[in-house]
Amino acid sequence: MSNTVFSGAVGPLRAAALSISRHRLPLLCAAGLGLTAVASWMWWRKRQGEAEDLQQVGIVSQLLIYPVKSCRAVPVQEAECSALGLKSGHLEDRHWLVVTEEGNMVTARQEPRMVLISATFCGNTLCLNGPEMQEVQIPLPLPKSNRVLDCRVFGQDIQGRDSGEQASEWLATYFQSSQPYRLVHFEADVMRPRQSKKKEKLFRDKDVIAYPDASPIMLLSETSMEALNSRLEQPVSLANFRPCIVASGCEAFAEDDWDDVRLGATRLKRVMACGRCVLTTVNPNSGVITRKEPLDTLRTFRQSDSSLKEVYKNAPLFGQYYGVEQTGIIRVGDPVYRVTRKG
């Protein structure tokens, strides 16, 4: 309201208007500061954009979250990419872990039938299902009175809150195991994540994970899968390789050269290739481990350069590990841009 309007106002109306103006002053100042911050950010982004080239190299075709390590994936259409990987509501990538009573991780390498377990969320309840098993429901959040276990994932120490006896009994029944297993949950607000570089030294200090093998993000292209399957007598699926992000619209193994990528609002930095192990030989439909294919075939054409043998040993390379450079939302259908510096 302008001063001209106020100039003809009677005393009480003018006083009330001035009082309102005084109350609005802090809000107007805050709004001004906010606009300044936004303008500064937009200027910085513009300068960054001027210094970089974006080349579309593919499309996000799938986003997959694995709530429990070594169990089935949950496909989502949209996910937040946090420093610890993909998340969508209660779904957080590999934030649940099966361990022994001593806290040692249990994966499909030891219990191949883990790949048949599905973990979904119904409201504030984690639901576990497996073949010939009744569903077990675990209310969330877990009670703070539940004990916190000291666990080990590839020799690294990390904590997890125990989910209780009902889940433990369900796992023992499913695996028909005389050894008791526990299901634990990583609570990011009170527990310290693992550092990726303690598993693979090529990672950066800031790359952190909960219970994944090494990286917050693993990306694989559909065309790389097709190239592998063209060499196999019995085709395998993406489920054998457990990527978080699947790309399409590119040449086979193009992801090997995507050192810096943008997907939606998210920016990822390629760290290293994913060296493959015996876990890839677990059939995701039967839960049977063969220890043969597709690993044997991968070894015939996806070995590392001799200069990198110290890093990868004899593991064939399939898919790429990424660190999270900038968090944000990723959606199925988003373009995948390779980012390069100008000049």
UniProtKB/Swiss-Prot annotation:
Chain spans, region MOSC N-terminal region: 95-186
Domain note: Comprises two structural domains, the molybdenum cofactor/Moco sulfurase C-terminal (MOSC) domain and the MOSC N-terminal region, forming a cleft that accommodates Moco. The MOSC domain, which contains a large seven-stranded mostly antiparallel beta-barrel, engages multiple interactions with Moco both pterin ring and phosphate group, allowing for a tight coordination of Moco within the core of the enzyme.
Transmembrane segments annotated in the record for this chain: 26-44
Pfam families: MOSC (PF03473), MOSC_N (PF03476)
A Gene Ontology biological process term: nitrate metabolic process
Binding residues annotated for Mo-molybdopterin, in chain numbering: K69, S70, R94, S215, R242, R276, C277, Y321
Intracellular or extracellular location(s): Mitochondrion outer membrane; Membrane
Catalytic activities: N(omega)-hydroxy-L-arginine + 2 Fe(II)-[cytochrome b5] + 2 H(+) = L-arginine + 2 Fe(III)-[cytochrome b5] + H2O
Full protein name: Mitochondrial amidoxime-reducing component 1
